[in-house]
Amino acid sequence: MVGWKKVGSFLSQYKSWCEAETGDRNKRLWKAKIPLKIKIFMWLIKVNAILTRNNLARKGWKCDKTCSFSANPESIEHLFFGCVMTKYCWSLVSIVIGADCRPASLNQYWVWANRFMPAHKKIHMIGLAAICWAIWRMRNSIFFEDIKKCRSPTKIICLASSFILYWSDPQSSDDKSNWR
């Protein structure tokens, strides 16, 4: 799984991109059946306000600016899509859903999700939120608790899966059948 491939006609790619750029994402975020703190977390990612190391440095905090998983500068785009560890996580998800590529950015995620899971639009935001939250939690464990570096992307994916199951628990029984 290497990067992003051009698939379909230019027109279909453009339509997918335009659809992804509309306010549809904001509606999906606030209507998603995920905890409010996760909705706020995802919104902070969207507006580049999560306190990654580069954002902390911009605020004057003196810290190592490198990613907890790799030796590259830690930005939102890098942490959630560009890091070697997170690329591997997205590759695992791609294999599970039968995709031949993985998203390389937040914007590409929406086109990718619409292409490979067109019948499951209600879970696009939930899946993205679970993976991003799992990456963030693992990053924070390394950053704040000084645990050994995570060498297993499967731990991140298992953590994301547990979030999805946990978040689905308080849902009504009618909605639960669509989650499992």
Residue ranges and their predicted role:
Residues 1-180:
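Charged boundary/loop elements
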